[in-house]
Amino acid sequence: MTNNYSNWTFKGKTVKNIEDMQIHEPKVWGFVYLMSLYDIKTGELKYQYIGKKNIYSKRKRSFGKKEVASMKDKRGKKYEYVIKESDWKTYLSSNSFIKDNANKYKIKREILMFSTNDMDLKYKEAKEIICRGCLEDDFFLNDGASLRVFGKKVM
């Protein structure tokens, strides 16, 4: 597959690393993006997609046998959380149409807004999908919006 996608941009400026994001949001956790698909031959805008991407992944790592054996308190937790940078630089989308047809379109990847936590990120994505009318228009490839919010945990 050839690389038909652009670098990520935010307000017209290229975003190449996390430091470029931290200029706008020092405690950035992820972003909401707009992906625009242009016909390679005509340059005509065909589809758009709103999505979200975490720039870090948080994984649960279980301790090995030696680590567990060296623990003073055997009743303690036998795992730790590891946070590392995600694949955001080369990320195309979770949308199957975009992944399957990426070589047929020139793809522009634009960051719309940054977020500092996962709950805020989910809220901003759902709000953007609903406010832009993505679910009512075939021009957008979005299939749905999902959000569960309890209390004042957002923002």
Tell where the protein language model's regions lie, with residue ranges.
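Structure-specific nucleic-acid interaction/processing domains
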Residues: T2-M155
